[in-house]
């Protein structure tokens, strides 16, 4: 009987990363097919953004566009090195990017803490470079924000949730938290945008630990 082992994914270095393209892969973004709002702005005064990676971005985007206070969502890539990457390039593991959902929200209606807590509860943030059967650095858990203050808020929530998970027998939390700029986020191809609205029976895995985060609205 033969056994086949998949090698553990390894993060690419900047020197090893693909060079990327000169132009965005989505040059003419269309309005959100569910919310009817733009996916690239201009944003209303007071609206904020957070970039969230919980594994495959199709189901994650759907989860967030259904939340009250979320004004727009889109899917793309961030956290890596390759400019204007294609989906195929990201899936190769040679860009350093993870699959990301950009969430534009009204902080008067929903807080950053609530968005982060919902994300943590929706996946298993202890799995490193995978979510279930989706294996690769592009499926890592990540929250990217625009300011250091926001990053500290997210890190505190992630750290507390990590201790909660350990008390239930899970391993170390591996969620990445960092500050990025909007220019560090690259929109994915049009067919990925609001994918589960266009394909209601499409792939939508669930990897929740079932452990509540404890952040109250």
From Swiss-Prot:
Organism: Corynebacterium efficiens (strain DSM 44549 / YS-314 / AJ 12310 / JCM 11189 / NBRC 100395)
GO biological process: cellular response to oxidative stress; protein modification process
Residue numbers spanned by region Disordered: 16-39
Catalytic-site annotation from UniProt: 56
Keyword terms, alphabetized: Oxidoreductase
Record-level GO cellular component terms: cytoplasm
GO-annotated molecular function: L-methionine-(S)-S-oxide reductase activity; peptide-methionine (S)-S-oxide reductase activity
Enzyme Commission number(s) of this protein: 1.8.4.11
PANTHER family: MITOCHONDRIAL PEPTIDE METHIONINE SULFOXIDE REDUCTASE
Catalytic activity: L-methionyl-[protein] + [thioredoxin]-disulfide + H2O = L-methionyl-(S)-S-oxide-[protein] + [thioredoxin]-dithiol; [thioredoxin]-disulfide + L-methionine + H2O = L-methionine (S)-S-oxide + [thioredoxin]-dithiol
Protein name: Peptide methionine sulfoxide reductase MsrA
NCBIfam families xref list: msrA
InterPro entries referenced in this protein's UniProt entry, alphabetically: Met_Sox_Rdtase_MsrA_dom, Met_Sox_Rdtase_MsrA_sf, MsrA_MetSO_reductase
Gene3D superfamilies the record matches: Peptide methionine sulphoxide reductase MsrA
Encoding gene, per UniProt annotation: msrA
Organism lineage string: Bacteria, Bacillati, Actinomycetota, Actinomycetes, Mycobacteriales
Protein role: Has an important function as a repair enzyme for proteins that have been inactivated by oxidation. Catalyzes the reversible oxidation-reduction of methionine sulfoxide in proteins to methionine.
Enzyme class label: oxidoreductase
Family stated for the protein in its record: Belongs to the MsrA Met sulfoxide reductase family.
Domain of life, per lineage: Bacteria
Stored HAMAP family: MsrA
């Amino acid at each position: 009987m033969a056994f086949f082992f998949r090698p553990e994914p390894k993060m690419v270095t900047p020197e090893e990363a693909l060079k990327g393209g000169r132009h965005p892969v989505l040059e003419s973004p269309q309005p959100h097919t569910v919310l009817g709002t733009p996916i690239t702005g201009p944003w209303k005064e007071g609206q904020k953004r957070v970039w969230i990676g919980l594994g495959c971005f199709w189901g994650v985007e759907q989860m967030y566009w259904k939340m009250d206070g979320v004004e727009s969502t889109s899917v793309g890539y961030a956290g890596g090195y390759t400019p204007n990457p294609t989906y195929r390039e990201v899936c190769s593991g040679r860009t350093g990017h993870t699959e990301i959902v950009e969430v534009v929200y009204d902080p008067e209606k929903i807080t950053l803490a609530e968005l982060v807590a919902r994300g943590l509860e929706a996946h298993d943030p202890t799995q490193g470079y995978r979510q279930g059967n989706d294996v690769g650095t592009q499926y890592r858990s990540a929250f990217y924000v625009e300011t250091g203050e926001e990053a500290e808020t997210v890190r505190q929530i992630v750290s507390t949730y990590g201790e909660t998970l350990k008390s239930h027998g899970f391993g170390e939390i591996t969620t990445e938290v960092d500050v990025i700029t909007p220019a560090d986020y690259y929109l994915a191809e049009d067919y990925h945008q609001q994918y589960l609205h266009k394909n209601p029976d499409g792939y939508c895995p669930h990897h929740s630990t079932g452990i509540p985060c404890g952040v109250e609205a």
